[in-house]
A protein has these predicted regions:
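N-terminal leader/linker segments that initiate helical-solenoid repeat arrays
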Residues: 32-78
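Short coil/linker segments at helix-helix boundaries
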Residues: 66-101, 108-145, 155-195, 234-241
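TPR/TPR-like (Sel1-like) alpha-helical repeat modules
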Residues: 133, 219-237
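Long, repeat-rich segments with strong aromatic
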Residues: 199-210, 214-217, 235
């Protein structure tokens, strides 16, 4: 499986519009890994090779999109990070154009678009938030148990529900975000629980599911999911960071 990013926020508080919809990350990235069914160690040489040349084939393009998102996640330079996400989006769009009948291109486009939204204003962010959903659903239509797309949809629903009431109303009424009315906590739970079921070894699924349980005040479920995340073996390059987040959030859970 490609590597994923934890897509939801560690902090527990209602979101303003400017703080929401930064969710293309699956998934939600891990620093450099990308290839299906590969361990972290096995992925590193392939990632380096992919980054060293301009991608041309479908597989090379979605892999390059994954690498660019992964590299951008913890990039501190705003301009460099924005450029990486723009590159990822361009690669993913080319991948989908070459092979619209495969789920990976759509998944990585949802991931890249969500990250690209980070640098944009509210109206553009809402527009891309809608595309995140569209591309994740396109991936699920082609591969109904695609864990990355399941993760994206789970976090998409959760992020909309985390918007404060005013922000959600503004997005729906004035910014073209009527589709946000479809979001629900029950769908957030359903998608993330299925992602964990399909891919139980992936820490980020359990971490983002724990955050949803936490926000729903399902404290014991949240505690169990956080503990499972902490106990997970490294699968993606940034799992050590996510494990630290899970450990701290578990400590603060009441």
């Amino acid at each position: 499986m490609p590597t994923y990013t934890s897509l939801s926020a560690p902090a527990r508080r209602p979101r303003t519009l400017s703080g929401a919809l930064c969710i293309g990350a699956l998934v939600a990235g891990s620093a450099v890994a990308l290839l299906p069914w590969r361990s972290v160690a096995a992925q590193l040489p392939a990632a380096a090779a992919a980054a060293a040349r301009e991608p041309a084939t479908y597989t090379e393009l979605w892999q390059a999109a994954a690498v660019a998102v992964d590299q951008g996640e913890f990039e501190r330079n705003d301009a460099v990070r924005t450029a990486l996400y723009a590159k990822a989006t361009a690669y993913a769009r080319r991948a989908v154009a070459l092979n619209p009948g495969d789920a990976e291109g759509h998944f990585h486009l949802s991931r890249a678009v969500g990250r690209t939204a980070l640098a944009l204003g509210p109206r553009e962010r809402v527009k891309l938030g809608i595309e995140v959903r569209e591309q994740a659903l396109a991936a699920l239509k082609l591969s109904p148990r695609h864990p990355g797309a399941l993760h994206v949809m789970g976090v998409w629903n959760a992020e909309i529900m985390r918007l404060n009431g005013i922000a959600r109303t503004v997005a729906k009424a004035f910014l073209g975000g009527q589709i946000f009315s479809t979001a629900s906590w029950s769908e957030a739970v359903r998608y993330l629980e299925l992602a964990v079921q399909v891919e139980p070894e992936r820490l980020v699924h359990r971490l983002d599911l724990a955050r949803i349980y936490r926000d729903l005040e399902r404290t014991e479920d949240a505690r169990a999911a956080y503990r499972a995340a902490v106990a997970s073996a490294d699968f993606d390059p940034n799992d050590r960071v996510y494990r630290q987040q899970a450990t701290e959030e578990l400590r603060r859970l009441k």
